[in-house]
Structures are given as C-alpha cells and as structure tokens.
C-alpha cells in the first residue's frame, strides 16, 4: 500500500443521511491551494453539485477541498437543491477556514431527494474537526452506495529524482455508462501542474478509461471526476514529464474503471470487448458498445454460455459497415465464428473452464479497415434485478 500524496488530509463522519449508521459524508482538504480539474456527466439533467462544481472550476481552476455526501443525489431538486448545495459549501468552508468557492461538491444517492440541511449543519463542524483522522481508504468507503467494496488505486513515479504520488478513489456499481454513471471519482497528486496541462491530461485519461466502461447502459445525473494537484512534493511537472504523469494518471483511472465493472451490481464477470478491423474508430466503438450493452450477451456470459449467435446479432445491428463473411468472433481465445458461420471447434467443451473465471475476452475482427476500440462491460445477473428493484426501499 502506497502512502497518500503529500499535503492532503481526509475526514469521514456519519451524518445520518442513510438508513444504516455508517460514514456517509467525506472530505478531502489540501493544505495549500491545488490546481483542480473536473470532468462531468453528459446527462442533460445535471445534479446541483455538478452545476455548482462546474461554476467554481470555470471561475478559477483552484480548489482546497472536495466534499461528497452519500444518500441524496441532489438531482432534479430545483432551485432549493441549488441553494442547498451552495449552503453546504458555505458550511464546510466556514468550518475549515476555506473560501466556499474553493470547495468542490459531489453527491450520490436517490434522485429527487433534497439534502437534509439540518444534518449538514450539525455534521460540518464534526467533519472539519476529524480532518487527519482518516485515510483515503476511509474516504472511498464513505462515498459508497450499492458498492460491494471501496475502490482505491495508487501509483508512485519518479520525476526529477523525486517521488510523486497519485491516489484515486471511486464509487459506482450501477447506473454506470459514463460519458463523461452514479460514478464519482477523486484523484489526488502531490506534483504541481498548470491548470491547462492538468485538465488536458484529465480529459485524455478519462476518455481512455472511465468512458470505456458499462454496467447497465445508464448514465447518471451526477457523474463527476475531480483531480487535485497541490505541488506538495516540491516537483513541478512540465515538458516531456507531462506524458509520464499522464501515463500514471491513466493507469490509476484504468484500475478504478476495472473495479467499477468488477463491482457492477450483482456482476460475476468483467467482459473485455475488443473490436478491430472497423472502417474507423467510431464504428469500432459502436460495435463494442452494442455488444457490451446487449442484455442477451450479458446474460449469456453470466450463464457461462458460449452463445456466439447473440454476439454476432449484436454486431450486426451496431450500424457498422462490414461484410458478414469477413467477421471473426473469438471468445477467451477460442474462435467461434468465421466465414459467416460457426467454426467446427467443440467450443462448449473448450470454454467450459475459461467461462468459470471472472475475466472474459470477446475479440471481434470486422475485416473492413484499421479502426479499433476496447470496452469493459459486466454481465447481467439476478442480483442486479434484485438490487435495483429494492433500491429505494
């Protein structure tokens, strides 16, 4: 386990936002102003904290704190929700001695539920007093909703002979189909980076990781990824070292993205859909997403069924351009389909053991060009239905 990046403190408390008594309010404070980046949901119904966080970052890409509550999403809550969100930043800022404009909010929970402001007023001073008593692992645990486990990824790298640390924390198990679903993540770094470079690195890393996962095809109103870089290591990243930092950032987000799919509500499989030979990358993405979203493919994977017909049918309705006879479908290294028909391999026997594992790879070659795309998707189980049927109760 790596140490946390320098210059960040963590706090979690139980504010009573959830039915069960457990930490449900989490705070990160940087000892010094940090360069801040953000990537947000593309859902047209954007939660109040998304709107407010965008405003704060647009005004000035600097932050001292991130505060996240679990229990109420504060989405579709009208003017009252916006006012409440800004009030929470005032409360946290006052308790911590930080300008409210330098506090970034995020919320997760039931859509349409107003924040419990009386509980916020009582909890904010306790939260500030607890700073330094918790770890980034505690933070990840406090922001969970239907998650089965906290999601943390750490990375160290050497720049200019000095160790730079990154840590990422995320939550999400359902409503995951980001296009930066609910998916929240915070990444901390103790290097100094210019706002322009940090945001650019963030956008690229999110596009290559979080935007390439799906659990159920639903995109949340609250999707948020924050990144804070405070320079506490004494290292300024610039020039050629930016690519090195970008690779480390992408690695952290990629591991978090895998955990999000691994922890998809009720999931037993992580399906890696790899499409190649498309006319272009956009068509490869269309194929990967159609296969990854297919309920028939997902349930086949859950049932350990080498049902190539469901995969081929999904490929065929993706809208991509190709000749049917050029398509090759391979599952866990076993070729199932070629020349417009199934192969003569005994793939049910060959795949009996591989399909018992958690990781499943679906390779689809279209033979139409050089476009390629890769997507992570979960399977679909009885537990997913049970979890979401009972979510509000």
Curated annotation (Swiss-Prot):
Main location: cytoplasm
An annotated GO cellular component: cytoplasm
An example Gene Ontology molecular-function term: L-glutamate N-acetyltransferase activity
Active site (UniProt): 182
Catalytic activity: N(2)-acetyl-L-ornithine + L-glutamate = N-acetyl-L-glutamate + L-ornithine; L-glutamate + acetyl-CoA = N-acetyl-L-glutamate + CoA + H(+)
InterPro entries for the chain: Arg_biosynth_ArgJ, ArgJ-like_dom_sf, ArgJ_beta_C
Annotated pathway: Amino-acid biosynthesis; L-arginine biosynthesis; L-ornithine and N-acetyl-L-glutamate from L-glutamate and N(2)-acetyl-L-ornithine (cyclic): step 1/1; Amino-acid biosynthesis; L-arginine biosynthesis; N(2)-acetyl-L-ornithine from L-glutamate: step 1/4
Positions with a binding annotation for substrate: 145, 171, 182, 265, 388, 393
Site (described: Cleavage): 181-182
Assembly with partners or alone: Heterotetramer of two alpha and two beta chains.
Family annotation (PANTHER family): ARGININE BIOSYNTHESIS BIFUNCTIONAL PROTEIN ARGJ, ARGININE BIOSYNTHESIS BIFUNCTIONAL PROTEIN ARGJ, MITOCHONDRIAL
Role, per record: Catalyzes two activities which are involved in the cyclic version of arginine biosynthesis: the synthesis of N-acetylglutamate from glutamate and acetyl-CoA as the acetyl donor, and of ornithine by transacetylation between N(2)-acetylornithine and glutamate.
Protein name according to UniProt: Arginine biosynthesis bifunctional protein ArgJ
